[in-house]
Amino acid sequence: MVTNVTDKYLKMKIHILGICGTFMGGLAQILVEKGHTVSGSDKQFYPPMSNQLDSLGVEMIEGYEQSSLPSADLYVIGNALSRGNPCVEYILNQKLDYTSGPKMLGEMIRDRTVIAVSGTHGKTSTSFLICEIFQAQGIDVGFLIGGVSDSFENSARLGTSEFFVIEADEYDSAFFDKRSKFIHYHPDTFIINNIEFDHADIFDDLSDILKQFHHAIRTVPANGNILFHDGDENIMSLIEKGCWSHTHKLGGEENIMLSIEEGVIYFKDQRLDLSDLPMHGQHNLNNVVMAMYTSFLHGIDPHKSLSALKNSKGVKRRFETVFKNNDKIVIDDFAHHPTAISHTVETAINHFSSQKIVGIVELASNTMSQGHHGSKLYDSASGLEQVYWLNLSSRKNQNFEYDSINLLLEDLKQDIDNVDVILIMSNKDSKKISEPIIELIKNK
């Protein structure tokens, strides 16, 4: 049965189904730190998550055979699992206690000051920037974030301070709870970076997504904060629909303004120079503005925030240089939506203005591979001299999409001598693309 059991007073045996995902693996980290005995099942276990779970002493069980399901006080069921899964059916038939990952996390952080970072783009980067600022001030912030940063050992930790930062996405919680994950977090500060249509596998249209954000806004207390950038009509429609918390429109009445041309942030009566920051592109600097203002609301001086971010190590797969030699550069980026692809392409063109750039875009998300973005998707990378579109799903949308990495590599091999920068964009395992390309470059 669905349980409301919290871990405030009990030390439990907890089994996580779907433990190898970033969220559930991060949840395992926090549960172990809280003193629980944790085990987990998944289809397969692979680094780096398998290494992280092993270091925590988590028993890992491959597959979902009913016979391999261990006894536990509580089962946490991941949103990738559905009815028909042997373990799920056994748990239901035996009326065992179960819950979702987001609900479990929400119960564990209920007594913390929660900063939830939501939106279609920039969640991971903004979350880590906030954590870097807090950590630089000696604040042992807790967090669970769906990415990897060299600034932190893991993508999750409990932390000892009052603050907890959570990457709050709008995907559903579990097969038995189709509400968005962020509805469970009850944030004190709710950041909405932007809202666009995505996740076509669970949302019919943009209004479906806006409804979930509206529900989340209704959970923010009257003394809480809702932060968003000026100019996003979708967010403004939500605020106008009903909001009971303090709102902060960055770039608007909050007197915090990003000037890309000047390379500065104007914050009230201060002028903050961004020239020494390691981030590239307006979208990343927007994340900086959001992180700095969030930190300001929680008592951190903007100059201290800026100083902390000058030492930022960034987030893996966010315009990350994965290879560089005398004449070739390979960049890996997580972009998987027309807006994100457009921003990443613009950043690459500005950063490598005199060099020939080609792009490889994998249509890996359901929304992309099923053609929901239409021509916007292909237009988003039109600034590049050449784009290779990789679609490994069974549904091809265009004749120029490659359904084989080997075929793509064969064509790239013909052009490689005339290429300076290769920009890979995918939200799946990009190493299957980057590693053979790097090998190709080395062997030329």
Residue ranges and their predicted role:
Residues 80-82, 122, 170-173, 196-198, ...:
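Short glycine-rich anion-binding loops that position phosphate/pyrophosphate groups of nucleotides
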